[in-house]
Every structure is written in C-alpha cells, then in structure tokens.
Amino acid sequence: MLVDSYGRVIDYLRISVTQRCNFRCLYCMPKTPFEWSAKENLLSFEELFMFVKVCIDEGVKKIRITGGEPLVRKDLYKFIAMISEYKQDIDLALTTNASLLKQQAKDLRQAGLKRINISLDTLKEDVAFKLAQKNILKDVLNGIDEALNLGFNVKFNTVALKGINDSEFIDLLEFAKVRKSQIRFIEFMENYHAYGDLKGLKSAEILNIIAQKYSFKQGEKSSNAPATIYELEDGYKFGIIDPHSHDFCDSCNRIRLSAEGLLIPCLYYDEALSIKKAIRNKDIAGACEVLKTVIKNKSEKNRWAENEANQSSTRAFYQTGG
C-alpha cells in the first residue's frame, strides 16, 4: 500500500501517453508556437508498462490513460491490453476528445477497456470550431455513438466558459441524460497556456443556469472523487467539478506520469521526479524508490489553497492530462 505523509492512500495513477493533440483548444493549448518532445524522449508502451506493474504491485487500483489526446498515439489498444491482462480487475479508464474513437473503439473494447470520459464542450459546430480551431464536432459525435453502441460506460466532461458555451448547459445535460451517461461541468482551471481572455463560470453560476429548467438536490460525494453530484427529480445525476470552491486535497489519491517519464505528485506543483533512467536500465527497485519518494513528498494542499490571488498553473495540461 502506498501512503503519503498525510495518511492518504495513493491508489490512482494517471498516465499521459502523449503530449500531442489533434485539437488546439483555447483553454489548454498555448497560443504561441511550440515544439513537441522528440519521440526518443518518450517512454515506449513497454517501458510505461514496466512502471505500471510496479505501481499495481504496490497497491494502485485505478489507472486512467490521458494525453494530450491519447488516441493519436499509435496502437494505444496494445498498451491497454498489457495492463488489463496483467491485472484483470484493475479499474482502467480513458479520457479522450472522441474524434478518433469511432475507428478505435472496437479495438479498445476488445483490449479490456470499459470506461471512457469524453470531453464535450458544445453541440454547436461553430462553437466547436472556435474552441478547437478546426471542424471536429461530427467526428466527436460519431465517436460518442460508437462508444455507446459498444457498451462502454461513458461520462462527459464540459469546461464551463462564460460567453462561449454557457447557453448550452441544459442542452448538454439533456444530451447526456438521453444517453444515460453522466455529465460533469468543470470550472475553468486558469493556466498560463490558455488564451488570456477566457473566463469561466463558478459552480453556483452553473447551477443557477440548470435551475432555470430543472429542480435538483445535492447528493453524496465520493471521498476520492473531485465532482459534487446533483440529482434531478427523475433520478438523473450530474456533477460539478469546482476546484475554485472546493479542493479535494484532503482525500487526493492520485499521482500522474507524463509521457517523458516525469512522476508528478500534484497538478498544481511543478515538482516532479523522473523514472526514465531507472526504467530504461530495467532497475525496478530504483523505479519503486522514485515512486515512494514522490508520494512521500506529495504536498498537503495545492497552490490554489496557499495563494488565492494567483490561481494559475504553469504546468501545461496537454502534458499531464489535466
């Protein structure tokens, strides 16, 4: 079992398999030109899996594959299969923009993937183009249909942006509701890579919009989950992830691994240690030591809690998966 200095059990690993993304979303990608990491600097699936085995053997029970956009990395399903074959009851999930999901969903399902979180910020083509800087909505919707048809457990994530998609919250909720999938509205997390004129909505503002049509009550919150759950009168449940108002640091159970091998204790801290050298030397004990050191050094609180006046992250979310 992995336990940090504050008694939190760390049993959730998020793996960013690539920095690359086929979208250029305003709230995530830098406006200025930048370069991707060279391929040789990235850990191979075999190298990532070597570390995954270390984590599972030490008590990790949940793994989420993220990016960038994870489906742009070739043969992702093979990595999924490695993990699910090693530990069949592992809670294994994927976060994706769904644009490439129609072509890959069947292979992912056969590899053992059961749960998918899909970023869905709008149902309007022009808004989707504005956000992603390309025509993507048709591919996203086709990917969603394919995932649901194959029986995946699907959740939707919507970043709440003032003046961009706030008029669609009820439509998005109903889109998810009809498909028997949960939607979570996420407060915009300010970061230095987002376009500077973006403004988010706080949880109270999101709830006020939904209350224009629906009555709801607050449900119970899972101790390790970031979302506060609300229930409509007909029993449908949706979530709000509100890091501005309610951090979940006290129950945080996660660490993050970048595609380059950086093990990151907190999304809002720049501190990280690399497992690359140990893994490429096949030094399993060394990799395990890095894991335990990162967990030991995990902060009690994120920097938002320490400095409300400067609520921006310097870390690129496309490198760590948010």
From Swiss-Prot:
Similarity comment: family membership: Belongs to the radical SAM superfamily. MoaA family.
Record keyword Iron-sulfur present: yes
Annotated S-adenosyl-L-methionine binding sites: Y27, G68, S119, M189
InterPro entries, per the entry: Aldolase_TIM, Elp3/MiaA/NifB-like_rSAM, MoaA, MoaA_NifB_PqqE_Fe-S-bd_CS, MoaA_twitch, MoCo_biosynth_MoaA/MoaC, rSAM
Protein name: GTP 3',8-cyclase
EC numbers, comma separated: 4.1.99.22
HAMAP family: MoaA_B
